[in-house]
A protein has these predicted regions:
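Flavin (FAD/FMN)-binding glycine-rich loop and adjacent Rossmann-like elements that form
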Residues: 1-199
Length: 199
């Protein structure tokens, strides 16, 4: 989910402990923070972009954040019930993460205090308990046709004469899998590459 929160006390609903909350889901975040020692949430914990009216657009930031890595594999080909369960699991994870950051005593105090400034906005998504109803599904299908666009197109090493569209954003893929390799946790799939013009 891309998250809209607010730090306006008059418009804020506190982030509360979600039903079925399990702090062990966030053990890796604690391990990461112990090593990385972020100075603030925007320091590779949450990507907090300020919006008008004391609100945010929050996105994934760092190796353990709002992306529920690896839990979406069955979404593209899943039936409605499978997709519904995946979305419910993602919602549970996301709300649990926000609560964990603000309330778990093992989190550094400065990050807990910063998180507690934020809450769900009373005036947003009033028909969905003030939480965005739209999951942040970046991509689930790739069209395979007579021509398949690749990194070579993005970096202008290969062009086509009969283009039907244009893109102007970086190559930006979030992690899609979490593995244990030689006793160490590894995320796989993150691509952040820019520095080129529209393609």
């Amino acid at each position: 989910y891309r998250l809209c929160l607010t730090n306006d006390p008059a418009n804020k609903i506190d982030i509360t402990r979600p039903a079925g909350y399990d702090s062990s889901m966030f053990e890796l975040l604690l391990r990461y923070i112990a090593v990385f020692k972020p100075k603030e949430l925007n320091d590779r914990v949450l990507k907090i972009d300020n919006m008008p009216n004391h609100k945010t657009d929050i996105n994934n930031n760092g190796p353990f954040s709002t992306d529920y890595i690896g839990m979406n594999w069955n979404y593209p080909d899943g039936d409605y019930n499978t997709r519904k369960q995946i979305l419910a699991d993602q919602l549970h994870y996301t709300k649990g993460l926000l609560y964990f950051i603000g309330h778990d005593p093992r989190m550094p105090e400065h990050l807990r205090k910063e998180m507690l400034q934020w809450g769900y906005p009373k005036d947003e998504y009033t028909d969905n308990n003030n939480f965005t109803p739209q999951a942040y599904i970046r991509e689930s299908r790739r069209m395979i046709g007579a021509y398949v666009m690749t990194q070579n197109n993005c970096e202008a090493r290969e062009t086509v004469a009969d283009a039907v569209g244009m893109a102007a954003y970086t190559m930006d893929s979030h992690n899609c899998e979490r593995l244990v390799v030689n006793g160490m946790v590894k995320n796989e799939g993150d691509v952040q590459k820019g520095g080129f013009g529209p393609y």
